């Protein structure tokens, strides 16, 4: 016959494992989103010809021409490395049966790191969005047109990359939330 305390212990252990599986899944999602964002941004290059007042102007665009896009690639690189490390550590601990966050210190470290990389991704996405908006709308006080009419593939690559950067931020914020749940449990 089972005592009530044993049943509660089994349920608590099962809940902890589900939370840990969700944490590992969030790490995997962040890794996939940030790696894909980086790959899409690195392939953002195109050449075209724009017609400005009857003059043919050759346009060439590459992600490396903009410091904001370079910042996006750098932020994605750091986040990929961090997420890969956390994912490998989480999978290892799941397979060995030990808790993913064995101490409060490590939980605080994960929380701080998730916040740091989350804000890094948000700032990179915001910086890239400003340049993308300028490319899409053109410069209003000069007669320069928007470049996205001529370089639509480049603009689509950049927009998809920035969408994935913001998705990576959501994964990091969710992972940070689960770490707060671990910290709030006595």
Curated annotation (Swiss-Prot):
It is found in: Cell membrane. Glycans are attached at residues 62, 135. The keyword Glycoprotein applies. This is CASP-like protein ARALYDRAFT_316979. It comes from Arabidopsis lyrata subsp. lyrata. GO terms for cellular component: plasma membrane. Belongs to the Casparian strip membrane proteins (CASP) family. Signal peptide: none annotated. It is a multi-pass membrane protein. The chain crosses the membrane at residues 24-44, 71-91, 116-132, 162-182. The keyword Methyltransferase does not apply.
């Amino acid at each position: 016959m089972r005592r009530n305390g044993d049943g509660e212990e089994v349920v608590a252990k099962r809940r902890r494992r589900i939370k840990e599986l969700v944490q590992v899944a969030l790490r995997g999602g962040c890794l996939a989103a940030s790696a894909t964002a980086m790959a899409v941004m690195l392939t953002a290059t195109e050449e075209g010809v724009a017609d400005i007042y009857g003059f043919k102007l050759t346009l060439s665009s590459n992600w490396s021409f903009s410091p904001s896009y370079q910042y996006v690639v750098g932020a994605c690189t750091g986040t990929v490395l961090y997420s890969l490390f956390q994912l490998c550590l989480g999978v290892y601990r799941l397979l060995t049966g030990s808790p993913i966050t064995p101490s409060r210190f490590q939980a605080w470290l994960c929380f701080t790191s998730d916040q740091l990389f989350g804000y890094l991704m948000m700032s990179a996405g915001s910086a890239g969005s400003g340049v993308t908006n300028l490319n899409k709308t053109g410069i209003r006080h000069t007669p320069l047109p928007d470049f996205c009419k001529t370089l639509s593939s480049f603009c689509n690559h950049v927009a998809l990359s920035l969408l994935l950067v913001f998705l990576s931020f959501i994964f990091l914020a969710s992972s940070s939330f689960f770490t707060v749940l671990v910290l709030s449990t006595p």
